[in-house]
């Protein structure tokens, strides 16, 4: 029988024998095999019995044959339904609507304690409902405590008083020389300045570069800052007291609050000044729709309750200032005042770019509260580099408040190219914008807020169980949106986005791979136009990339590592002998836009935008690689992979895998478009060398030894975002790579690392929950309070982190974190397959969801854009659902087959290359049975508009059989090493760990088994890294069902009671009903324990789980029974290493996954007794404290504590 080829099978035919309920848990499906048997049984039926039956069977045969042909076509691509570990068959049904996720109030409340693990959160706050971040601490100016405003074109970092320009004056860690500086390459003093998109200067030399010799062949390009447009100041009593960032001291300020609304991008600052006599409130915003408009609102009022008895009036001079000294790397073109319009203006040019300038035009309205009469400026000043208007007002008890609205038009040459009135000068347009806005504050504010609200209607992420993660998702969206725009972007220039956006000159404001690989993909599913604008910048600089290749004698094109105004090869951005992978990154970003397929992205885009970039990159790499006749493979040389700790190496793994993948893209796209395809591309793609150790661990580069410390994700990038895996052998190697390199990341490395591990773990591991522990590891060490901005480093102290002054804010991390949710936890990937007959590319969406035990209730991605359709992606506790909510075109979805994954089949080194140790780390797994057939493909679906596809979530197995603690909630009661998170100790991954900050003091982890899930611990195991502890103790909090019920009910009562009297009465009745006596005492006689330490543990527990309850206990003595003491069931058990130390590891020649040390223990309850003799109910517990102290080898210079990889507790 001739097989009919069809890439997509018919959705209706696919589910004729399935239960169409959207809930798939515990549903049975007969599968393809049973349907094949039915077909064969029909074909053997005796047709002679009845002519009528013959006719009926004839018709039925036609129908069944059609089904069989469709089935055969499917089987060409997938036998995934035969996998015993996971049934990927889904149900397509009419859309059920919004899919509200379950809300777990206890998990949500507990998650709020995670904020306290953020750096500098002690005086910060977050209003969840209104999305407001803020601080009550008036501090000296330091970058991490400053918010900013931006709209994708203009931006300004806001100092402590709420407006103006300020240099940093505080470093938390040291006052060493350079402590207040930014990092490479400028190494200049950090400042709260103002910036304009694409306003680049040219510098003959920079303070720090990688290739200074290239300064002789081309200037470097870095961002210039413009005069600070938020600069308002006021002075009192003949200018004897000034209110500006330079003159306001810590002692002058009380009742301080500064907050950032992520709903609308407004920064509000309020404070009392001068013995609380004056109240100052400011609001700053960059108009979301009118990009060249910045607005400052300032209210100055008398606090009448704090005025002296002889107070009469207060003279105030308000200064609207433009000061050239607040800009950097610019030349002053002109400055002046416009007395007719009460305005000041200034024009600056970026250094060495006379063809560009930026004009700033500022005008104010000044009115008393409840007055309609504006006050005109009384004086104007024009100095050499400062222009100002002065408004004199008198505050009295009858007129106690003055309101200033400052409207600033900002126009640069780069933005003016997009305007219809291109003949207008920049100053003319800036003036028009400011004057048209003047006096329309409320109307402008309303339109500004509406523009922000409209943006959020296009994108939303829900994580109901975790306030911190949801806030981080929201803040990441906010920060990326604040620094990009989807219109008013020149198509022939695009949108260059620097690492720190529009509020900082970190990394010189230059464009790195951060824009292509980290930020753009995070925006693409929600804001494809913004992503395309960012990619258009690479299109605009493509012609220069071709000149770069020509300069070095290569065909094709070579992008430099850094770009700005131009994309020439510079000392910061060399084109050769450095990070060649940038060419893969740019190509991947462009191809991803095609695979996403938003409006207008079709074969024309592929032919005229993506194809030239990929073709030229393929041409360059074809000439660059060298054939090694001894290996019979192609090699690369003298390069740097993403791990910048290793420079000038050969055969970088990610670079070579990128070349392999890119050459495949070039072949596939060329064939699809009917273009000429170089046969050499396929040959090199097939035969490029990826270095591996004898144990099949991918080496980051040729000659790598085991002493390596990795700066950032490198080899793991082959899994995501590159998608290098294309057969089972590579998949198995990738799993080993994930394990190996997870233990070799620098503790102080950049925040772009662990989002990649989230995606890799979710896609590669069938056990544990490390995809979620990596998610926390992506946030907790890097996110900075109070304004939820990411730092580049987990440790901001340049004296302890390798002399790195972190970029801030680090938008790269915002993009990475969003990708870890959008693509990591959901398993979503843009993908394609090639029809083997026509060579045509067919775009599809891969969906590979897993259960998320650390995130009860799941996650929801609202308004995901794909193929110009709008989707909701829902991961709840049992099912994954894609809802086709808007659009009129079906989409193609593929569910991969996870039966290929063998994440436990790891053989460990045993001191000999020829003998492998039996798998000591092999974790017990409950297998239903081995898969009937390995299949690298999956199951395909066609999802039509107003339908939804629901698939059963893959349920990862337990790492260790019957481990009651795995995937449960955990918190560290003592400090850990920067970059470590406690979740790693229970995540079912033997290659993640938590490590105490020091080895001297006792370190503690507190585990919560969950509500109504108390267990009696009988035995367990601690899996150590190469650094075991000296001893271990375990304590439990004796618990009972009565206590559990009271615990939950008291919390509910607290949330619903309206006043203290009602609260006390209700709790009293609850305790009476439960039989709790007025004087409730629990007998702990006979138990030797450290009372103070036990009480501290209880206090920590209450603070973690129920902070309000801890306060309530102090008010209601009868609740003291909840302060049960922890009972020590394992006391200072000494630890002995279970594994030898291999000499090959010491001499750095060993590239192996080493077996871990372990300590097993059993609990002897006969030596313990609590309460009445014979009573064993106390042994059950929900809360456990695991304490470790010291390290086994206490003679090294490392002050950090033991490495705890996994805690296993059995009942």
From Swiss-Prot:
Recorded catalytic activity of this chain's protein: alpha,alpha-trehalose + H2O = alpha-D-glucose + beta-D-glucose
Lineage: Eukaryota, Fungi, Dikarya, Ascomycota, Saccharomycotina
Transmembrane segments annotated in the record for this chain: 47-67
Keyword Transmembrane attributed: yes
Chain intervals for the UniProt region annotation (Required for cell surface targeting): 70-131
Record-listed E.C. numbers: 3.2.1.28
Source organism: Saccharomyces cerevisiae (strain ATCC 204508 / S288c)
Recorded phenotype for the gene knockout or disruption: Abolishes cellular acid trehalase activity. Abolishes growth on trehalose carbon source.
Lineage top rank: taxon: Eukaryota
InterPro entries named in the record: 6-hairpin_glycosidase_sf, 6hp_glycosidase-like_sf, Gal_mutarotase_sf_dom, Glyco_hydro_65_C, Glyco_hydro_65_M, Glyco_hydro_65_N, Glyco_hydro_65_N_sf
Active-site residues (renumbered): 644 (proton donor)
Gene coding for it: ATH1
EC main group: hydrolase
All ranges on the Periplasmic side of the membrane: 68-1211
Subcellular location(s) of the protein: Membrane; Vacuole lumen; Periplasm
Protein name as annotated: Periplasmic acid trehalase ATH1
Keyword annotations from UniProtKB, A to Z: Glycoprotein, Glycosidase, Hydrolase, Membrane, Periplasm, Signal-anchor, Transmembrane, Transmembrane helix, Ubl conjugation, Vacuole
A Pfam family that the UniProt record links to this protein: Glyco_hydro_65N
């Amino acid at each position: 029988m001739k097989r009919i080829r069809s890439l997509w099978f018919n959705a209706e035919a696919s589910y004729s024998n399935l239960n169409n309920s959207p809930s798939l848990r515990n549903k049975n499906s007969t599968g393809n095999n049973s349907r094949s048997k039915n077909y064969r049984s029909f074909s053997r039926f005796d047709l002679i019995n009845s002519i009528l039956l013959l006719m009926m069977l004839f018709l039925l045969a036609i129908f069944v044959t059609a089904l069989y042909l469709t089935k055969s076509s499917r089987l060409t691509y997938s036998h995934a339904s035969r996998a015993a570990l996971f049934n990927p068959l889904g149900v397509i049904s009419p859309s059920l609507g919004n899919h509200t996720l379950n809300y777990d109030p206890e998990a949500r409340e507990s998650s709020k304690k995670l904020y306290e693990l953020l750096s500098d959160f002690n005086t910060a706050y977050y209003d969840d409902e209104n999305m407001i971040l803020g601080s009550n601490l008036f501090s000296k100016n330091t970058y991490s405590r400053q918010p900013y405003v931006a709209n994708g074109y203009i931006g300004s970092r806001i100092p402590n008083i709420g407006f103006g320009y300020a240099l940093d004056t505080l470093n938390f860690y040291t006052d060493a020389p350079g402590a207040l500086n930014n990092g490479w390459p400028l190494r200049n003093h950090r400042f709260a300045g103002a910036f304009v998109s694409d306003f680049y200067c040219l510098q003959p030399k920079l303070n720090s570069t990688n290739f200074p010799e290239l300064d002789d062949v081309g200037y470097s390009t870095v961002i210039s800052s413009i005069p600070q447009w938020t600069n308002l100041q006021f002075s009192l009593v003949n200018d004897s007291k000034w209110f500006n960032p330079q003159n306001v001291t810590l002692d002058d300020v009380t009742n301080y609050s500064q907050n950032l609304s992520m709903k609308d991008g407004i920064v509000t600052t309020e404070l009392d000044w001068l013995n609380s006599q004056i109240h100052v409130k400011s609001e700053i915003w960059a108009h979301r729709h009118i990009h060249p408009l910045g607005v400052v609102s300032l209210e100055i009022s008398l606090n009448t309750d704090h005025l002296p008895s002889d107070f009469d009036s207060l003279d105030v001079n308000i200064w609207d200032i433009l000061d050239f000294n607040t800009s950097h790397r610019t030349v002053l073109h002109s400055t002046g005042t416009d007395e007719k319009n009460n305005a000041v203006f200034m024009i600056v040019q970026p250094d060495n770019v006379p063809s560009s300038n930026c004009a700033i035009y500022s005008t104010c309205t000044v009115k008393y509260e409840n007055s309609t009469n504006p006050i005109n400026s009384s004086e104007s000043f024009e100095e050499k580099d400062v222009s100002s208007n002065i408004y004199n007002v008198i505050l009295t008890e009858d007129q106690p408040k003055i309101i200033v609205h400052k409207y600033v038009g900002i126009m640069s040459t780069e933005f003016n190219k997009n305007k219809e009135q291109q003949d207008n000068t920049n100053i003319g347009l800036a003036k028009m914008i400011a004057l048209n806005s003047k006096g329309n504050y409320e109307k402008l504010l309303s339109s500004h807020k509406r523009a922000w609200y409209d943006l959020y209607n296009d994108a939303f992420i829900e994580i109901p169980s975790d306030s911190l993660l949801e806030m981080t998702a929201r803040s990441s969206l906010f920060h990326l949106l604040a620094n990009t725009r989807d219109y008013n972007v020149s198509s022939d220039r695009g949108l260059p986005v620097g690492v720190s956006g529009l509020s900082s000159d970190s990394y010189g404001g230059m464009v790195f791979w951060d824009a292509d690989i980290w930020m753009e993909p995070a925006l693409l599913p929600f804001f494809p136009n913004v992503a395309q604008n960012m990619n258009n910048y690479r299109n605009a600089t493509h012609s220069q990339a071709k000149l770069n290749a020509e300069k070095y004698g290569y065909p094709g094109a070579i992008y430099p590592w850094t770009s700005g105004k131009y994309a020439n090869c510079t000392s910061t951005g060399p084109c050769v002998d450095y990070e060649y992978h940038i060419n893969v990154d740019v190509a991947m970003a462009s191809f991803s836009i095609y695979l996403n397929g938003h409006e207008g992205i079709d074969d024309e885009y592929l032919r005229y935008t993506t194809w030239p970039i990929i073709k030229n990159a393929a041409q360059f790499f074809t000439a660059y690689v060298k054939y090694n006749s001894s290996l019979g493979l192609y090699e690369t040389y003298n390069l740097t992979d993403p791990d910048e700790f290793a420079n000038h190496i050969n055969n970088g793994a990610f670079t070579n895998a990128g070349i392999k993948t890119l050459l495949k893209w070039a072949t596939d796209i060329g064939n699809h478009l009917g273009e000429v395809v170089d046969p050499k591309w396929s040959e090199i793609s097939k035969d490029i060398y990826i270095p591996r150790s004898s144990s099949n661990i991918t080496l980051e580069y040729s000659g790598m030894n085991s002493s390596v410390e990795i700066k950032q994700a490198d080899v793991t990038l082959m899994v995501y975002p590159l998608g290098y895996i294309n057969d089972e052998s590579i998949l198995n190697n990738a799993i080993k790579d994930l394990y190996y390199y997870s233990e070799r990341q620098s503790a102080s490395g950049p925040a772009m690392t662990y989002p990649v591990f989230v995606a890799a773990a979710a896609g590669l591991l069938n056990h544990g929950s490390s995809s979620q522990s990596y998610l926390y590891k992506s946030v907790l060490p890097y996110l900075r309070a109070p304004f939820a901005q990411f730092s580049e480093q987990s440790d901001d102290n340049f004296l302890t982190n390798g002399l790195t002054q972190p970029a801030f804010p680090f938008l790269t991390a915002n993009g990475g974190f969003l990708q870890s949710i959008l693509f990591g936890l959901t398993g979503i990937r843009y993908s394609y397959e090639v029809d083997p007959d026509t060579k045509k590319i067919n775009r599809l969406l891969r969906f590979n969801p897993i259960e998320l035990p650390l995130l009860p209730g799941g996650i929801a991605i609202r308004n995901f854009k794909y193929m110009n359709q709008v989707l909701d992606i829902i991961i709840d506790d049992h099912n994954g659902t894609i809802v086709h909510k808007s659009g009129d075109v079906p989409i193609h979805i593929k569910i991969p087959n996870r039966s290929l994954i063998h994440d436990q089949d790891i053989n460990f080194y045993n001191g000999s290359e020829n003998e492998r140790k039996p798998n000591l780390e092999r974790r017990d797994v409950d297998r239903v049975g081995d898969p009937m057939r390995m299949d690298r493909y999956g199951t395909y679906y066609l999802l039509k508009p107003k339908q939804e596809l629901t698939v059963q979530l893959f349920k990862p197995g337990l790492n260790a059989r019957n481990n009651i603690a795995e995937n449960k909630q955990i918190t560290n009661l003592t400090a850990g090493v920067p970059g470590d998170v406690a979740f790693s100790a229970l995540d079912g991954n033997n290659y993640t760990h938590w490590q105490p900050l020091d080895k001297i003091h006792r370190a503690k982890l507190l585990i919560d088994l969950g509500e109504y899930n108390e267990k009696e611990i009988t035995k367990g195991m601690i899996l150590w890294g190469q650094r075991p502890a000296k001893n271990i103790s375990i304590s439990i909090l004796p618990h009972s069902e009565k206590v559990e019920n009271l615990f939950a009910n008291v919390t509910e009562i607290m949330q619903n009671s309206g006043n203290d009297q009602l609260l006390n009465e209700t709790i009293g009745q609850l305790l009476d009903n439960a039989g709790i006596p007025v004087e409730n005492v629990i007998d702990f006689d006979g138990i030797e324990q450290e009372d103070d330490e036990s009480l501290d543990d209880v206090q920590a527990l209450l603070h973690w789980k129920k902070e309000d309850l801890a306060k309530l206990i102090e008010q209601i003595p009868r609740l003291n029974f909840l302060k049960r003491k922890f009972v020590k069931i394992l006391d200072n058990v000494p630890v002995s290493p279970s594994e030898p130390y291999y000499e090959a590891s010491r001499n750095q020649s060993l590239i192996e996954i080493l077996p871990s040390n372990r300590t097993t223990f059993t609990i002897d309850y006969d030596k313990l007794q609590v309460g009445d003799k014979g009573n064993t109910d106390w042994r059950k517990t929900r809360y456990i404290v695991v304490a470790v102290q010291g390290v086994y080898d206490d003679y090294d210079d490392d002050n950090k504590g033991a490495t705890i990889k996994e805690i296993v507790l059995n009942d």
